[in-house]
């Protein structure tokens, strides 16, 4: 978690943003060069306040929302949100670049979407009332060439691609079993539920 990392003395004076997680990822790969290795990066992504989620160099869309909801126009809020997505794209690229020569698969999922309208933002609305953008969110899966060079991994990835092609809905509740299953972990004592593993179907 980035706040824990950034509170360490070795990071004094550094900006607090998601890119610090990429450095930790790279360090972890160096410290643990062998065996199976799961790394979880808990990002802030596009959580409000949006302007706190990206450095000034990524303020492409302007004017931005620099205050609380009712002090900003809807367009200013959208601009700031879009800037945060631009920085997330950069974060993902740096993550993938760190893993291109590794036997790696990456799952990226947000916990919720965001609604922006009439100078306010919303998320976490109860499911029965939440608008579609809050509860229907994309998931991204990326794999390195080295990972895909193995036939078993290629077959697993094809199953993931089929879910996309067929527009099959997937749910967070199956993410744990799918990350482990698609990564090649096994669990003879039933720790991985194959009915929840996207790569097992």
PLM-predicted stretches and their roles:
Residues 1-201:
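Catalytic domains that recognize anionic headgroups
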């Amino acid at each position: 978690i980035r706040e824990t990392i950034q509170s360490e003395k070795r990071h004094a004076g550094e900006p607090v943003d998601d890119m610090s997680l990429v450095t930790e990822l790279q360090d972890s790969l160096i410290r643990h060069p062998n065996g199976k290795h799961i790394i979880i990066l808990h990002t802030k992504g596009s959580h409000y306040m949006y302007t706190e989620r990206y450095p000034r160099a990524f303020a492409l869309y302007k004017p931005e929302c620099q205050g609380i909801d009712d002090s900003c126009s809807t367009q200013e809020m959208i601009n700031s949100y879009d800037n945060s997505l631009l920085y997330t794209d950069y974060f993902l690229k740096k993550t993938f670049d760190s893993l291109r020569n590794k036997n790696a698969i990456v799952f990226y999922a947000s916990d919720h979407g965001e609604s922006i309208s009439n100078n306010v933002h919303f998320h976490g609305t109860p499911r029965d009332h939440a608008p579609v953008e809050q509860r229907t969110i994309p998931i991204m899966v990326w794999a390195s060439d080295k990972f895909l060079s193995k036939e078993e991994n290629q077959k697993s990835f094809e199953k993931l691609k089929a879910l996309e092609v067929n527009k099959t809905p997937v749910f967070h509740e199956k993410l744990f079993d799918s990350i482990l299953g698609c990564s090649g972990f096994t669990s003879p004592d039933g720790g991985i539920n194959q009915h929840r593993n996207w790569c097992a179907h």
